[in-house]
Amino acid sequence: MKWINTACIAMVITVNAMANALPINGMNTGQIAALYPNLFVPAAATFSIWSVIYLGLIGFVLYPFISRKALDSSVSLLFQLTCLLNISWIFAWHYLLIELSVIIMMAFLGVLIAIYKKLNSQNRLSFWLLDVPMNIYFAWICVASIANVTALLVKWGIELPYPELITVFLIGVTQVLVWFINSTKNNIPYSLVIIWALLGIILKRSYSSPFFPEIVVAAAAGILFTTMYTGLSWRNQLMTSKPV
């Protein structure tokens, strides 16, 4: 199973690299996103988080090689499914099948939720190589799912009134997610990814016109809330149990 996991992540990294190097269907991933402009999309630099995600996933597949404990077979199967969905999404997105890409993204998110529920590390090695990578992955796909649905609305030509307020609402959705995730189990990696995404939104607005100060204020407030609530959740966890 561990060799299959290794092959799967190698395929994911290869396909994602090809998507921008070739690129697939003549456009890179960012150029396609530009076809469906919306105020929720963060600055291009924000997407560098994929380097962190892939580095973490490499650690994830290496875990069975360096640990005496094998990775749960059900988690391995779910991980392999995420790899298939990741690759499928790339092709759907690059061939402008946005409706299909949303369906794939929702399935992708569902599988990551299943993995999130199954992982519960009992030692530092599994925490850093299993929990942290998957929490980062899960958080970013939450953000990507919101952006993907927004892109679909743009493709359909649905012009909602006051797009800046819609974006403020979407930022609010990220905060509901932070609250829900951290109220069940303190998750600093998840929160850090949300902060990163909100910083990307602020950066994008700083060099875009119009500026939309309400979006910047909402994103800044989101960063503050995420930091404070995650810190409070972490403190409560320390008071009730031993740290991992």
Locate the predicted segments by residue.
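N-terminal membrane topogenic signal
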Residues: 1-7, 50, 192
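Alpha-helical transmembrane segments and their membrane-interface exit regions
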Residues: 106-117, 171-176, 198-201, 222-229
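Short aromatic-rich membrane-water interface segments that cap or initiate transmembrane helices
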Residues: 34-49, 130-134, 157-161, 165
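Central hydrophobic cores of alpha-helical transmembrane segments
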Residues: 81, 189-201
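Membrane-interface helix caps and helix-loop-helix hairpins in membrane proteins
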Residues: 89-103, 121-125, 154-161, 180-185, ...
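Membrane-interfacial loop-to-transmembrane alpha-helix junctions, especially the N-terminal start
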Residues: 70-79, 186-191
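Alpha-helical transmembrane segments of multi-pass membrane proteins
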Residues: 9-26
